[in-house]
Amino acid sequence: LRELIGKNLVYAYPFEADTRLKLKTSVTAAAAKDEDEPMNYLSLDEEITTERGIAMHKFMENLDFSAEDAASELSRQRAEGLIGEDQAALLSLPALQKLLESGVLGFLNGYTLFREQWFTVNVPAPLCGLEGGEIMLQGIIDLLAVKGDEAVLVDYKYSGKDAPSLVKTYERQLSLYKYAVEKSLPLKVQKTYILSLSLIHISEPTRHSLIS
């Protein structure tokens, strides 16, 4: 299965953060169709929040899930060149420690974890809220957890939105990720989750009937 995932869902480690965001644009754009407000240029505060969000994603990408001390874990990632000094400086050690102590992803014990899996898959345009036939969809799955022929997807968000707002905004995105995995791999996605890295809260969208 690991070889199959490597073939159909390709690791994204070689890509820089700005490339990562560009690759996610198509899925994010599809999710944005559920937003009530138009997308505007980022303010300075929003730009800082975005940079901190990218840094949090990088920390999570390389996180040893058995780590108990945030300072030691961040030092390890810095020493191994897994996270840059500028990104590390954006992170709050108390917030990271709270995340480690929360056990919010403890339910994934026993799963094989695949991180930062990017994909390209053809999907019917209506699933993205568009007209026409099939379109090519690109995206990155933050965390794909596999046990047997079943899978769980987790998407990380660093946002000021509360949990219900995150679900409303990104449930289509998670549905598209589920579709991509099940189309590309012999897996059945049992659950999808949004993990708010700012709230340290995990939510489960329930909109998958859109694309079943």
Regions found by a protein language model. Give the residues of each.
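Flexible loop/turn segments at secondary-structure boundaries
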Residues: N122-P124, V152, G160-A163, S203
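Short, glycine/charged-enriched secondary-structure capping and boundary segments
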Residues: V167-T169, R207
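The DNA-recognition helices of helix-turn-helix-type DNA-binding domains
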Residues: Q77, G160, S209
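Residue-level detector of conserved catalytic or cofactor/ligand-binding positions
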Residues: S198-S212
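Nuclease catalytic cores
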Residues: L1-K147, A151, Y170-R172, Y179, ...
